[in-house]
């Protein structure tokens, strides 16, 4: 009869089984906390009452009854020596008893938790998604918290400032088995300057994008269309960012050469505090760069010193400026002085006002193309020179 009645009874549902397990687990956890509190309370009471009893016994024996003989004194003092040891043993016994209770309680608790975990795994395999989600939210909140932590991004969310854009790459999956499409350059518009790769977007590019973004027939709306000449905004980094993961060979080479992250300085933008690569110690103070994110021009901290000009270059420049005058001075002939006659006086011969000065040729009127003066004047003998001197007198 009982078997027939048990057949007609409905089996408990998964929710009811989990509720019963939750109640048992909660009772066992409360019992464990209760045992822990009772252990502390009993140990505290044992030590307190034993200390008070010990002090009272010492005071009574000292006040009313102290034997005169040495043997009597030892017999009276022996309980006072054994009493602390007895209290220590009682404390150890209490700790052992409560530890055994706690161990049995923990074993039952682990069994119930394992059974609950097994039922939850069966629920995830057998129940529908909606029922499984409700059961997990109700009876397994830890797994829900783990899923939320996994889905949440690690670190603070980056909000772009005004004038600063975050660069995202749109990667469209290519179909396997087909060759990649060859880009066909469109008609170039004359007069529109092309932007350098990695530079800030120019106006000419924005004017040509509406024509390039026209959707071709047969392409879906959501698929991105590649545009010729498009590049991420911002100039390239002033110096490349060194890789974080470096091998042993790279470290050895950096140690021998004296290069590496520990020997470089980071280029931080003064406006948006963004990292723009690393520069060497020698060029850090003299480098000026434009930020790759906010386009702010960061000036150099110091101006690079320039070496003074050598004096040889100045002398060469002076000589190259006036070569004709030097040539004229070197080309003038030095005529030998005419021998003076005995009759001639010490006074020099003065030419008349009307006589032209044929002997003196000014160097200012001479030109490089004129013939040299010594080629036109014939040489005279000593006798002819004496006759001409007498005629002048």
From Swiss-Prot:
It comes from the Eukaryota. Residues 95-130 form a coiled coil. The chain crosses the membrane at residues 46-66, 70-90. Residues 340-353, 364-383 have a biased composition (Basic and acidic residues). Residues 176-190 have a biased composition (Pro residues). One of its GO terms (molecular function) is identical protein binding. It is a multi-pass membrane protein. It holds the Pfam family Zn_ribbon_10. A zinc finger (C4-type) spans 269-294. GO terms for cellular component: endoplasmic reticulum membrane; endoplasmic reticulum tubular network; endoplasmic reticulum tubular network membrane. Phosphorylated. Phosphorylation occurs during interphase. Phosphorylation also occurs during mitosis; these phosphorylations reduce both its homodimerization and the ER three-way tubular junction formation. It is found in: Endoplasmic reticulum membrane. The keyword Endoplasmic reticulum applies. Its main location: endoplasmic reticulum. Residues 1-45, 91-393 are cytoplasmic. Keywords: Coiled coil, Endoplasmic reticulum, Membrane, Metal-binding, Transmembrane, Transmembrane helix, Zinc, Zinc-finger. Residues 146-209, 314-393 are annotated as: Disordered. The keyword Transmembrane helix applies. InterPro entries: Lnp, Lunapark_Znf. Residues 67-69 are lumenal. The transmembrane domain 1 and 2 function as a signal-anchor and stop-transfer sequence, respectively, generating a double-spanning integral membrane protein with a N- and C-terminal cytoplasmic orientation. Transmembrane domain 1 and 2 are probably sufficient to mediate membrane translocation and topology formation in a N-myristoylation-independent manner. Transmembrane domain 2 is sufficient to block the protein secretion pathway. The two coiled-coil domains are necessary for its endoplasmic reticulum (ER) three-way tubular junction localization. Endoplasmic reticulum (ER)-shaping membrane protein that plays a role in determining ER morphology. Involved in the stabilization of nascent three-way ER tubular junctions within the ER network. May also play a role as a curvature-stabilizing protein within three-way ER tubular junction network. Homodimer; homodimerization requires the C4-type zinc finger motif and decreases during mitosis in a phosphorylation-dependent manner. Belongs to the lunapark family. This is Endoplasmic reticulum junction formation protein lunapark-A. It comes from Danio rerio (Zebrafish). The lineage of its organism: Eukaryota, Metazoa, Chordata, Craniata, Vertebrata.
């Amino acid at each position: 009869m009982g078997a027939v009645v048990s057949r007609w009874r409905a089996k408990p549902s998964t929710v009811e089984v989990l509720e019963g397990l939750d109640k048992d687990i909660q009772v066992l956890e409360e019992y464990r906390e209760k045992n822990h509190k009772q252990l502390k309370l009993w140990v505290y009471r044992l030590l307190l009452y034993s200390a008070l009893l010990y002090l009272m016994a010492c005071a009574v024996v000292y006040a009313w009854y102290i034997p005169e003989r040495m043997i009597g004194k030892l017999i009276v003092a022996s309980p006072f020596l054994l009493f602390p040891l007895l209290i220590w043993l009682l404390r150890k016994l209490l700790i052992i008893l409560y530890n055994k209770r706690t161990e049995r309680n923990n074993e039952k608790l682990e069994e119930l938790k394992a059974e609950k975990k097994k039922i939850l795994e069966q629920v995830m395999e057998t129940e529908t998604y909606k029922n499984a989600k409700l059961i997990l939210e109700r009876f397994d909140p830890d797994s829900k918290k783990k899923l939320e932590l996994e889905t949440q991004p690690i670190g603070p969310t980056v909000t772009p400032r005004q004038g600063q854009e975050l660069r995202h790459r749109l990667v469209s999956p290519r179909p396997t088995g087909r060759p990649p499409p060859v880009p066909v350059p469109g008609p170039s518009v004359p007069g529109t300057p092309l932007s350098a790769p990695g530079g800030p977007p120019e106006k000419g590019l924005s004017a040509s994008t509406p024509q390039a973004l026209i959707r071709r027939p047969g392409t879906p709306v959501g698929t991105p269309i590649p545009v010729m000449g498009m590049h991420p905004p911002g100039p390239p980094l002033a110096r490349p960012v060194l890789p974080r993961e470096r091998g042993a060979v790279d470290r050895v080479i950096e140690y021998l050469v004296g290069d590496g992250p520990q020997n470089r300085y980071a280029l931080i933008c003064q406006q948006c505090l963004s990292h723009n690569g690393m520069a060497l110690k020698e060029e850090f103070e003299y480098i000026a760069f434009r930020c790759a994110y906010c386009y702010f021009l960061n000036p150099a901290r110091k101006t690079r010193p320039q070496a003074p000009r050598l004096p040889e270059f100045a002398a060469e420049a002076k000589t190259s400026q006036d070569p004709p005058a030097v040539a004229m001075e070197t080309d003038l002939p030095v005529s030998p002085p005419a021998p003076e006659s005995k009759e001639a006086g010490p006074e020099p011969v003065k030419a008349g006002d009307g006589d032209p000065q044929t002997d003196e040729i000014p160097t200012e009127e001479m030109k490089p193309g004129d013939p040299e003066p010594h080629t036109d004047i014939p040489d005279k003998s000593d006798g002819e020179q004496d006759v001409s001197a007498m005629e002048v007198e």
